Amino acid sequence: MTNNAAAPLYSLRGLPLIGWRDMSHALNYLFADGQLKQGTLVAINAEKLLTAEDNPEVRALIAAAEFKYADGISVVRSIRKKFPQAQVSRVAGADLWEALMARAGKEGTPVFLVGGKPEVLAQTEAKLRTQWNVNIVGSQDGYFTPEQRQALFSRIHASGAKIVTVAMGSPKQELLMRDCREVHPHALYMGVGGTYDVFTGHVKRAPKIWQNLGLEWLYRLLSQPKRITRQMRLLRYLRWHYTGDL
């Protein structure tokens, strides 16, 4: 498939994932024919597939998202193993968010930011405006009560945002995006986890060589040894991969 406005779907554990060849393909897909798609973007890695397997609510949230894409190298390798002809590459969520913001700045697309600490959010806004002239029409840090959610949704709707990015971690961000779409459906939503922290330099990402080798997970483990328990869960995913139970 060579049409940049289209992309094949590949199923892993019953979830259809978009197969993007590279970042350019992803952007052309999301901005097909000059029209930004509407729906929810969810980055899929091995850990998220495991969580979806064990938690029906998380699985339902992920399944309902229109645009599920391979964020983790293990997921990319599983797609290639199950579908040998697949032309799919890893599109890291943090990189996709930056590319999306750059494109939004170029086209004047209105953006609303949710999540993060107040100081991190303020720095994110300032850097986006300085770096790409992003049209930020509103923001809300991650410190709000359940009772304040509806007011936030109303603010997002009133802002006219066409892109809403939510940095609250999974599954909180997926829950918020699902509920916000009931009030403001005509936008592209993206859950971005800790991306604002990385973007503003508060958290160091793995060097490019580690990323290119598909070893970003190992860098994070070496930097944060307490992640070992989370990483041990991935042995189950490896069993799926090597036994073909995908």
Curated annotation (Swiss-Prot):
One Pfam family, short name: Glyco_tran_WecG
HAMAP family in the record: WecG_RffM
Biological or metabolic pathway of the protein: Bacterial outer membrane biogenesis; enterobacterial common antigen biosynthesis
EC class name: transferase
Record-listed E.C. numbers: 2.4.1.180
Any GO molecular function: lipopolysaccharide N-acetylmannosaminouronosyltransferase activity
Record PANTHER family: PTHR34136, UDP-N-ACETYL-D-MANNOSAMINURONIC ACID TRANSFERASE
Signal sequence segment: none
Source organism per UniProt: Salmonella schwarzengrund (strain CVM19633)
Designated name of the protein: UDP-N-acetyl-D-mannosaminuronic acid transferase
Protein encoded by which gene: wecG
Function recorded in the entry: Catalyzes the synthesis of Und-PP-GlcNAc-ManNAcA (Lipid II), the second lipid-linked intermediate involved in enterobacterial common antigen (ECA) synthesis.
